[in-house]
């Protein structure tokens, strides 16, 4: 199972998750939520990327949570996450 991703966790190019659940915390950090913007990490599609996939079964505040392997609209995927929380 992939690790849960959180606000500030990054994709392989360094773009970071910008949307976190205000009331759901993992390892002291807000849980990353689907359809999050990703910080700009290059030109073209990398300057306005959003997440395109998330856990199909785990939700926070009614929104699917992000995890390592969650895709981004620029073609990258999330590569950072919680060291000890895993989600399907």
Region locations from a protein language model:
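Intrinsically disordered, low-complexity proline/glycine-rich segments
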Residues: 2-88
